[in-house]
Amino acid sequence: MNKSVLIIVFFSTLITAQDKYFIYFKDKGPENSYNQLNKNSAGYQEALNSLTEKAVERRIKNMGEEYITFEDLKIFTDYKSEIENLGVKIIRELNWFNSVSAYLNSYQIELIKQLPYVKSVEPVKKLFYKNDFKYEIDNSLLKLSDTTYNYGLAYKQVNLSGIPFIHSKNISGQNVLIGILDSGFDWKYHESLKNKNVIAEYDFVFDDSVTANQSGDIQSQDRHGTYVFSLLAGSTDSIVIGPAFNSSFILAKTEDVRSESQVEEDNYAAALIWMESLGVDITTSSLGYNEFDDNNSSYSYSDMDGKTTIVTRAVNLAYLRGVSTFTSAGNEGNTKWKYITAPADGYNIISVGAVDEQGNIASFSSRGPTYDGRIKPEVVACGVNDYGALAHTENSYMFASGTSASAPIASGIVALLLSAFPHLKNEQIRNIILESSSNSLNPDNNIGYGIISAKNAIEFPNLQRISNEFILHKMIFEDKIKESSVDIVFKIADDLLQPFNMTESNKYDYIFSFPQKSNGEVLQFYITYSDSLNNFYRNPESGFYRFVYGTEVISLNLETQQYQSYNEVSEFFPNPFIPADHKTAQIRFNSSGNELFKIFIIDGAGQKVIERNISTVSGDNLFEWDGFSDRGYLCASGVYYALIQFSGKEYGRKLVLLK
């Protein structure tokens, strides 16, 4: 670049207003992506070294041994350097999206768009939170003597979901790491929070490690996050006790309330990436967004489709790495908008609506469905007049209402579940929560699958896979159970029912190892036992639990749509798929003929790549993909997901594409 151009660029930087933009790159450097993902490569090792041991353990549990993906590779250093040489200061590096964010003027935007390795330059939207968070200060005390702990005025909000019962069994969130994204946290001095095990905290507004108020914040900045933290994990006897009071925590301040409650998309995504790398098991966010800065254009209801907003795409990617993700459904029930708000529209996030202590839906609680028709919210919890800590005090509390109050209660229940069963994968957790909530037989777009229950979730049977062995776990809490009476009765297809004795492995936990079967066979079972008074119990009371051998998800009321026999719709082959070496990636399936096989493939960021509608023939059918998008370009290296609708069922298939 000659001197005159430099002067023009410099002068323009001074006089042109700057907004924040995402700069998306086409690749992660000139090296072949297959080589970059080689376990001996520098790029692979750098990605691996960015993860804590706990993060690696969680990924392996949920993803298997191929737990480093293209999204995890660092952004190519030379690309960043060339961008910075244009006078640009990079604000956030988002490896998952192969992008950086930076403040740019119009001249810089045009220069950057011309760079051969830049895919696109797009505005970072400012997400405005319509905060209907209502509160009043109250220091009343209420002692309750019929539970293991005295919950004080917080009793009604935890009792609705059966939390005191689980606490009485010495399950309180031990060995679980929870990440909270909120407005800030004044936790070090309040009596209910000061002894919490906070392993890391970061302020994504001011870029420092202080999440409590500091110079530049308004007084109410950290009020919301402090209150939310106490609902999840506060512990002051006779005043407030949250569900996960023995868990560990990571805190991220992502919301700026100095003028309006807002968070920039890149900060939210960066916080999730950071938490995931530290090994978080669960994330919870009480921030929901549907209104945006007019200068950056607004999202609409049609964007609440699980794959459009950056915050939603970020929670999708966190889930794919084994994190159980929670968020408030939103407080839009009384507004013209009415619907859930991003990131509650995510595919696998558990969005949480609000009910009162009697279980009645709160009028303000956002409703579903998503734009593409999925039921939302997933569950509800008490979110009316919940009792929690007041920031900037040592021992004052307040009542408040909102789905921002119900979300931490729900995420705390999952901490109890994971504490009881550390082997659970996040897809199992999500299924258990939906199956065990109060409305699972008739889910709707008001309360979803119903009121979440800690007791029901932990009593729901689950599977642990060790090599090729499938071990059933069933918690039985009834008093004076005859250990020798606990039986599982199961069958395959129309075979005769066979009873087998279960053994107690730990207190309350009875186990059974299923005999080896062929993948795809459907097993049905129920469990029986009796107590010392000869009372007989059958679980479930009628019908059967069921699961497809080779998978780890047990169903009762819900369809096992994505867990059907492998013989119906195959996995991708070859996988990984290398277009230079293989002509196509293939999926095989059987059909009776004249059926519609609908498939669309999305990339790791949730963007649709192709869509196909295939009319089937009788017998074997074949779907092939050559790696090219519907727009005609060869797709970048990364993880791709096929969503399939066929024969009244839905399937999900994963493919790694390497160039």
Model-derived features with residue positions:
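Hydrolase catalytic cores
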Residues: I250-D256, D281, Y339, G383-I447
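Substrate-binding/access-modulating region of protease and related hydrolase catalytic domains
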Residues: H167, Q174, S235-S238, L251-N348, ...
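Glycan-association/targeting regions that enable binding to alpha-glucans and other polysaccharides
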Residues: E459-E559
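Subtilisin-like serine protease catalytic core
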Residues: Q18, Y34-N35, S120, F165-E264, ...
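Glycine-centered coil/turn sites that cap beta-strands in beta-rich domains
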Residues: L558-I601, L622-W625
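C-terminal tail/sorting-segment detector
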Residues: L558-Y563, V569, F573, A580, ...
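Autoinhibitory propeptides
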Residues: T77-V158, P164-S168, K194, Y347
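Glycine-centered tight-turn motifs at strand-turn-strand junctions
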Residues: N594-L596, K608-C635, Q645-Y651
